[in-house]
Amino acid sequence: MTPPPTSTVPPYVSLIVRILTLICLLISFIVIATNNQTVSTVAGDVKIKFKDFYAYRYLIATVIIGMAYTLLQIAFSISLLTTGNRIGGEGFLLFDFYGDKFISYFLVTGAAASFGMTQDLKQLEGSDNYSKFLNTSNAAASLCLIGFFFAVASSIFSSYNLPKRI
């Protein structure tokens, strides 16, 4: 009797998904890092930027960590494509599996914190003055969320690549 077939994902598919993840996270980083607006108040003009809010700082942190992990995984994927050998052998598959799970859910917490902060700020009186800032923050969080979906796809692929043990 032959063993059941294993489902594996071709390395180039995994590489493409990781590159798409990196692109979304990079654009999210650029959008949130450059997000600022000058608002006129009774006390004078005030420049608001992402650094003024903990949730947006958290979004930047999750995006940076996500980009670092994704760059590492892209390097490993390129190595697998060019040499045909997986770095670290079968033990690396567990790092890949757990790392993908952690990073994907870490990214969604950054996006969720940013969405929540934006929603809270929109409910404040006078939020029309800084709606451009809030909309740009939502755009960055949305890109992080799209990056999360690509990271989940990578997570599913790494689950398929685990050896089947009975």
UniProtKB/Swiss-Prot annotation:
Q: Enumerate the transmembrane spans.
A: 13-33, 58-78, 92-112, 139-159
What is known about the tissue distribution of this protein? Mostly expressed in stems and flowers.
Glycosylated residues, chain numbering: N36, N129, N135
Which keywords belong to this entry? Cell membrane, Glycoprotein, Membrane, Plant defense, Transmembrane, Transmembrane helix
Cellular compartments annotated: Cell membrane
Q: Decide whether keyword Secreted is in the record.
A: no
Its Gene Ontology biological processes? Answer: defense response to bacterium; defense response to oomycetes; response to abscisic acid; response to bacterium; response to cold; response to ethylene; response to jasmonic acid; response to salt stress
The UniProt record describes its induction as:
In leaves by X.campestris pv. vesicatoria, faster during compatible than incompatible interactions. Induced in leaves by treatments with ethylene, methyl jasmonate (MeJA), abscisic acid (ABA), beta-amino-n-butyric acid (BABA), NaCl, mechanical wounding, and low temperature, but not with salicylic acid (SA).
Residues on Cytoplasmic side: 1-12, 79-91, 160-166
One Gene Ontology cellular component? plasma membrane
Under the heading InterPro entries, the entry gives: CASP_dom (IPR006702)
What membrane topology does this protein have?
Multi-pass membrane protein
Segments in the Extracellular topological domain: 34-57, 113-138
Of which family is this protein a member? Belongs to the Casparian strip membrane proteins (CASP) family.
Function summary: Required for defense response to Xanthomonas campestris pv. vesicatoria (Xcv). In heterologous systems, confers resistance to bacterial pathogens such as Pseudomonas syringae pv. tomato but susceptibility to pathogenic oomycetes such as Hylaloperonospora parasitica when expressed in Arabidopsis thaliana. May be involved in the regulation of responses to bitoic and abiotic stresses.
Question: Additional comments on file?
Answer: Susceptibility to X.campestris pv. vesicatoria is enhanced upon virus induced gene silencing (VIGS).
Indicate the quaternary assembly.
Answer: Homodimer and heterodimers.
Q: What is this protein called?
A: CASP-like protein PIMP1
